[in-house]
Amino acid sequence: SEIQPYLSLTNIRNAAFTTAERLFDIKFKEIEKFPKYHEDVEGYEVIDQEDNLIGIFLTDYYARPSKQGGAWMTSYRDQSKNDGVVLPIIINVCNFPKPIGLSPVLLNLEHAITLFHEFGHALHGLLSDVTYPSLSGTSVPRDYVEFPSQMMENWIRNPEVLFEFATHHETGERIPEELMSKYLASQKFNQGFATTEYIAASYLDLAWHTEKKEIEDVNLFEKKLFKEKGLPIEIDSRYQSTNFSHIFAGGYSASYYSYMWSE
């Protein structure tokens, strides 16, 4: 796409770090050497305004054959103070294309938004300040857990952030205002379609977890549900039951609506 040459992984990561630094008075200091499970993993000390270490942030951004698809945040160690001060260790895992030679990784729009989204989850874990680990970081009601991540997405759509960090990977030229305006407009295009997809998926999730009868035919179950809800035939659910991992093995059972609720 036209905007991709301006969205190098390095630039977008720096945009995320700088946004967090300005919002929360923290700093990210790269760790040169540390034990890691793969060479692609990078690590950062997260430091507050008084130079106190508040957590460790790890990134594993590149796709590889042995890695599960998708993107997520994982807490290797939750913050707590119940039995002494325990600092969080948080990782963001993505599947961006790995660089070839000296070429930079160029992200598409979806990848850039994903980086900010998962970084929001990471900040939720890193900035946690609770006594008990059971309440730490993302261990909150599902109604709220997507709020920090959805909020962070807004910053990659912010003109000031884009103009500062979206620079051409070869020339260093800042993104032209006309191109930036086209990108921002594209984020608002066809929102009725996208919203209906999300609503349909949320209904499907709730239907699976409230249906008392045994479901023998998944396709028939879906068609009947969407007909009852008045889903236009031109629009399908964001997910079908057979690939809707969020609600069966992803911790979002009867809670997929929380994405829209957080928005």
Predicted features along the sequence, with ranges:
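Cation-handling catalytic/transport regions enriched in His/Asp/Glu
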Residues: S1-E263
